[in-house]
Amino acid sequence: PIKGAPYTRSVLDTYRNNVTACLILSTSKEKGSFDVAATDKFLYALAPLPFATGLFPLALGEEINIEFLPAVKDAVNMSFSERNKLGFKMAMKKDLGFFFGLGSVAYAVSLSLSSMTSGGGGIKLSELMKCKAHMILRLLQAKHRCKKENRPLLPKDLFHLKGFMVAGTDNLCYKDDLEALWGIRPMELFAGTEPSIMGTETWTRKGMYFFPDTAFYEFITEKDMMKNHEDPSYIPPTY
């Protein structure tokens, strides 16, 4: 069975505004410091529609014309592995500014990128010659540095992300590893199929803030929650 949720135009408008805010916040290191441009490139590591994450590039496209690698219309017809390989090859040619995915998926993609650059299945010379000059130089410098430090090539050696976002319930398990791989700490988002995007971290990367216009929130105390677990017939007061 597929879990679905009706999204009205007003819900989509709110969602668009909030994901755009997340994009901007993901680049910030302090209040008032942001860095987003329409020429930025975004690695596509999201499940396509009908999954909720498939809305992200479509909604963002209504606000800013950021290029996804690979293009959304092509990515939706590819397997996970095919998207990774093509996205990486395109990123080497065009550079990369943003990355967003579920925590575990982002980790898998990151390891995949590392294996593609470190293993025998890396970029061929013919493909390398299609890359921008600064990317070729960056790759050569990265390989020299990694050989000197006796370590594998990591995504952070090739790409200097402006923003990195993760969502999902398992982010705590991967955020430190993802930071080590990319050299930037991912900003966590909280979202679901029914309410869409509900909260985000900010430049501190410590704690999340609710989007007040996404849903009508109700809260119960931890004490009442535990009481409800013990006695399902108990109806806790909400705030």
Residue ranges and their predicted role:
Residues I2-K3, T53-F56, S110-S112:
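Short, conserved acidic/polar surface loops in the N-terminal third of protein domains
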Residues L12, R16-I24, L43, F88, ...:
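Short, well-ordered alpha-helical packing segments
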Residues A59-Y239:
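Active-site glycine/GP-rich loop and adjacent strand/helix microenvironment
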Residues P1, T27-K31, M92-D95:
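Short, solvent-exposed loop/edge-beta patches enriched in aromatic
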Residues P1-N17:
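Conserved AMP-binding A3 loop
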Residues K3-Y7, S33-F34, M187, Y209:
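Short, surface-exposed helix-loop/turn micro-motifs enriched in polar/charged residues
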Residues V19-L69, K73-M78:
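Conserved AMP-binding loop of ANL adenylate-forming enzymes
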